[in-house]
Amino acid sequence: MGCTVSTQTIGDESDPFLQNKRANDVIEQSLQLEKQRDKNEIKLLLLGAGESGKSTVLKQLKLLHQGGFSHQERLQYAQVIWADAIQSMKILIIQARKLGIQLDCDDPINNKDLFACKRILLKAKALDYINASVAGGSDFLNDYVLKYSERYETRRRVQSTGRAKAAFDEDGNISNVKSDTDRDAETVTQNEDADRNNSSRINLQDICKDLNQEGDDQMFVRKTSREIQGQNRRNLIHEDIAKAIKQLWNNDKGIKQCFARSNEFQLEGSAAYYFDNIEKFASPNYVCTDEDILKGRIKTTGITETEFNIGSSKFKVLDAGGQRSERKKWIHCFEGITAVLFVLAMSEYDQMLFEDERVNRMHESIMLFDTLLNSKWFKDTPFILFLNKIDLFEEKVKSMPIRKYFPDYQGRVGDAEAGLKYFEKIFLSLNKTNKPIYVKRTCATDTQTMKFVLSAVTDLIIQQNLKKIGII
């Protein structure tokens, strides 16, 4: 009897049908476990137009739930901020001339010291004073050229999709096909830009003849990364440049006048912070603080994932680049989203896009939010709208009327609360679904305020997720 039982057992084990069933059971069990893990994972999508403050929100999440920033990140930001500080002051000098603003530093007789500071600054090439590999390697260099070379303005437009709704279509196909009209428009734009840029370059070369022997516009990037890395000469030291920037920022009235009109051209949003703290950034061995990193900006390219745990809940935050050329990648992370965090820069109602200076940033954000909110991809997905940079908004509305850019605004000039309610109403009115939209007012660089806001938001999202999976 024992042999018979043994033979039967061996026969069962070798039965192909039984083997397939057991294999299927293992696969099914694995899928169920994975499905359960997916249910427990809260997947957030962080979206918004370029320079809205998305990445700063993510930095705050890292500070709260990931233990902050690595030593390498702190060194990287120190390099990037130093380069941006030099270029930002150069931009103010050059833009002042384009805007017809008289600079004290242009007068070598009555303002000899400031004139000398200007010469020091415009002779300095920012890339000579940083370690490009620490700053981010080729990604940093490419972004640097696109940001600071006026010759690349046309290239930024070409890389742009040209319209907010061209990020993706409802069938899931990435919209990257240009019509004949698009091509004709680009050709005309390139010709117009070429004429205008050539004219500007000639004028700038004339202006810069007193700055160096070549008469080159120092804002234009003329070196390849290989040439930069191979260059050993250091005619100026960091302290010289820092002192020049500090003197120009504190003592040249024209620089401050130009800065007050920075909505008319592209300038780093934290330029004033860089200038106010320029001496510490001048140290080649400086290690950035949390505040420095929150103020600094490194362009988001592609899609980054950040994971952290809050209690028993696992969060995954997807941060996608906000500029138009990056949006075609968004569709790859639309599936399985628990909530969308949309970041809106309130203070940029009077500014133009970096990638297309013919388009108002707030108008772009409105169109983008409308497209995402009513997309089939997010039919039942709750949205959390961050009205960001409200500190800058509250200051700006005192001198820059909202009605100048939004004629239907009826609130009092300088009334920040009325302005916030006006824009909040615009965004909420776009909702053509029954999904909830939660609005939070934020200053993403204020750690204490963001700690409170993000704690409230994560608690809300956890509750929403528990409802979704049927636990409550």
Curated annotation (Swiss-Prot):
- Locate the region Insert: 127-235
Substitution effect: residue 2 to A: Abolishes both palmitoylation and N-myristoylation
Q: Where is the lipid attached (S-palmitoyl cysteine)?
A: 3
Give the required cofactors. Mg(2+)
Taxonomic source organism: Saccharomyces cerevisiae (strain ATCC 204508 / S288c) (Baker's yeast)
The record's subcellular location field reads: Cell membrane; Endosome membrane
Q: What is the effect of changing residue 467 to P?
A: Impairs pheromone signaling in a and alpha cells
Q: Where is this region: Disordered?
A: 162-199
Name the record gives this protein = Guanine nucleotide-binding protein alpha-1 subunit
| Residue segments, region G1 motif | 43-56
Residue positions annotated to bind GTP are 51-56, 294, 300, 322, 388-389, 391, 444
SMART domains to which the protein is assigned, alphabetical: G_alpha
- Tell me the function of this protein: Alpha subunit of the heterotrimeric guanine nucleotide-binding protein (G protein) that mediates mating pheromone signal transduction. Binding of alpha-factor or a-factor to its cognate transmembrane receptor STE2 and STE3, respectively, allows the receptor to serve as a guanine nucleotide exchange factor (GEF) on GPA1. The exchange of GDP for GTP on the G protein alpha subunit alters its interaction with the G protein beta subunit STE4, leading to dissociation of the G protein beta-gamma dimer STE4-STE18.
Main localisation: membrane
Entry keywords, A to Z: Cell membrane, Endosome, GTP-binding, Hydrolase, Isopeptide bond, Lipoprotein, Magnesium, Membrane, Metal-binding, Myristate, Nucleotide-binding, Palmitate, Pheromone response, Transducer, Ubl conjugation
* The protein's assembly and partners: G proteins are composed of 3 units; alpha, beta and gamma. The alpha chain contains the guanine nucleotide binding site. In its GDP-bound form, binds to the G protein beta-gamma dimer STE4-STE18. Directly interacts with the beta subunit STE4. Probably forms preactivation complexes with unligated receptors STE2 and STE3. Interacts with FUS3. Pheromone-induced activation of GPA1 increases its association with FUS3. Interacts with SCP160. SCP160 binds specifically to the GTP-bound form of GPA1. Interacts with the phosphatidylinositol 3-kinase (PI3K) subunits VPS15 and VPS34 at the endosome.
Which residues are the lipid attachment points (N-myristoyl glycine)? 2
What is the activity regulation entry?
A: Alternates between an inactive form bound to GDP and an active form bound to GTP. Activated by the G protein coupled receptors (GPCRs) STE2 and STE3, which serve as guanine nucleotide-exchange factors (GEFs), and inactivated by SST2, probably acting as a GTPase-activating protein (GAP).
Cross-link Glycyl lysine isopeptide (Lys-Gly) (interchain with G-Cter in ubiquitin) per UniProt, renumbered positions = 165
Mention any additional remark: Present with 9920 molecules/cell in log phase SD medium.
Region: G4 motif, residue numbers = 384-391
What residue spans carry the region label G3 motif?
Answer: 315-324
Modification after translation is described as: N-myristoylation by NMT1 is pheromone-stimulated and required for palmitoylation of Cys-3. This lipid modification anchors the protein to membranes. Depalmitoylated by YLR118C/APT1.
The root-end lineage is: Eukaryota, Fungi, Dikarya, Ascomycota, Saccharomycotina
Impact noted for substituting residue 15 to V: Slightly reduces ligand-dependent pheromone signaling
